[in-house]
Amino acid sequence: MQVGEEMASLTKIACPIVMTSLLIFSRSIISMWFLSHLGKVELAGGALAMGFGNITGVSVLKGLSVGMDPICGQAFGAKRWTVLSHTFQKMFCLLIVVSVPIAVTWLNIEPIFLRLGQDPDITKVAKTYMLFFVPELLAQAMLHPLRTFLRTQGLTSPLTISAIVSILLHPLFNYVFVVRMRLGVKGVAIAMAFNTMNIDVGLLVYTCFSDSLIKPWEGLALRSLFRGWWPLLSLAAPSAISVCLEYWWYEIMLFLCGLLGNPKASVAAMGILIQTTGILYVVPFAISSAIATRVGHALGGGQPTRAQCTTVIGLILAVAYGLAAAVFVTALRSVWGKMFTDEPEILGLISAALPILGLCEIGNSPQTAACGVLTGTARPKDGARVNLCAFYIVGLPVAVTTTFGFKVGFRGLWFGLLSAQMTCLVMMLYTLIRTDWSHQVKRAEELTSAAADKSHSEDETVHAEVQDDDDVSSNDLEIGLLQNTN
């Protein structure tokens, strides 16, 4: 396979994901802007609530849905179409069930935060935000499996279009709820949930009326929802752990900020910096998603060399981006914070930490791409082990020791993250170097076979016409659904 062709295939999948992710992450920036104009306490409380919502809700749902990636990607490559629909159905049900205890946790955050030593004023604002943010769980439970279901078929533009419409409405919703209706922090939370719901509506409309994809409800039967869970759960659980371990690190950083000399300024600055890392993360995330899809297709189609080529090219792209991101944030360290606040103390903390954040991206970008390879090869347990070691055995002790032991303060937390990212990168590269790609092809066959529900008396056969098997996109994929009886 030509290197140029594979790079074009990766960028065709990744570019719409970059645009979509920027749009989705920009909603947090818009929300932070409205919070900053409500006051310093509101900004700090809102940032704390967003972080808590991400690590206890969004990260869990997103992590579980990552378990779909290897099954759907490899099933698509192996042309086992029914497996895609059944996997979506099971994942949606799983996320709905998991959302219940998450919602209960959100509704009881005040005693949790106070026992952890957080400022009472900040905690009160965070409690209010989380109360009105609960509908986001239902919206996320639909969004994550549906976007994965579409992406593994090479369909990324529907999400981009839905995100564009949704983000255009987001400032309007914030203005109506926060300014006109004077709901304050409540309005910011409601507007955020509305944003995700709007994306869901767009994707569902596309799914219902488009003839260019496998339908997620194909083969839906009550008994199919009670069978064949193990392949999905065995991937979803470690995937969730891997994602959550990384997400939780940022929440720990927020909590540690609350123990510094000026908790309000430190928490607010950390919230803005975490949003900044979110913006920078969209390109590595897109590369990772593209790698996972292409590697899954290659392994499902019995092409180990193509999977290895995809891995190498993806890592090269990720390294180049990491270097560019480091230069970008370092150059803008004196002006970046002014986009969010005019508080001198907060601006000083942001400016001091941005160069360290830039160094973190040099490690974060390629290690995120490497995570995509592990996802595409159905090895989430390896990713979980790496994140546990890098972030909690190495990074957390470095952060605590540097911040409080050596009295470095706010920047010490970011030195901890830097050590974690570099450790993670080294361990990921070591894991990939030892990969036996021929063995991964055999594992892909075993996985898709196990995920197929062979107990049904009926199965659906889907005939796909693809102009170029190595270049699947929403423009060249035509799928007709035919029902055959065994």
Swiss-Prot record:
Q: Which UniProt keywords apply?
A: Membrane, Transmembrane, Transmembrane helix, Transport
Instruction: State its location(s).
Output: Membrane
Q: Which GO terms describe its biological process?
A: xenobiotic detoxification by transmembrane export across the plasma membrane
Q: Which GO terms describe its cellular component?
A: membrane
Q: Which residues cross the membrane?
A: 15-35, 45-65, 94-114, 130-150, 159-179, 187-207, 240-260, 267-287, 312-332, 346-366, 386-406, 413-433
Q: In what ranges is there compositional bias, type Basic and acidic residues?
A: 453-466
| Matching CDD domains | MATE_eukaryotic
Q: Which domain of life is it from?
A: Eukaryota
Tell me one Pfam family matched here.
MatE
GO molecular function annotation: antiporter activity; xenobiotic transmembrane transporter activity
Which InterPro entries does this UniProt record tie to the protein? Answer: MATE_euk, MATE_fam
Membrane topology classification: Multi-pass membrane protein
Q: Which region ranges are annotated with the description Disordered?
A: 448-474
Q: Which residues form the signal peptide?
A: none
Tell me the protein family, please.
Belongs to the multi antimicrobial extrusion (MATE) (TC 2.A.66.1) family.
Q: NCBIfam families per the record?
A: matE
- Tell me what this protein is called: Protein DETOXIFICATION 53
This protein's species is Arabidopsis thaliana (Mouse-ear cress)
Q: Which gene encodes it?
A: DTX53
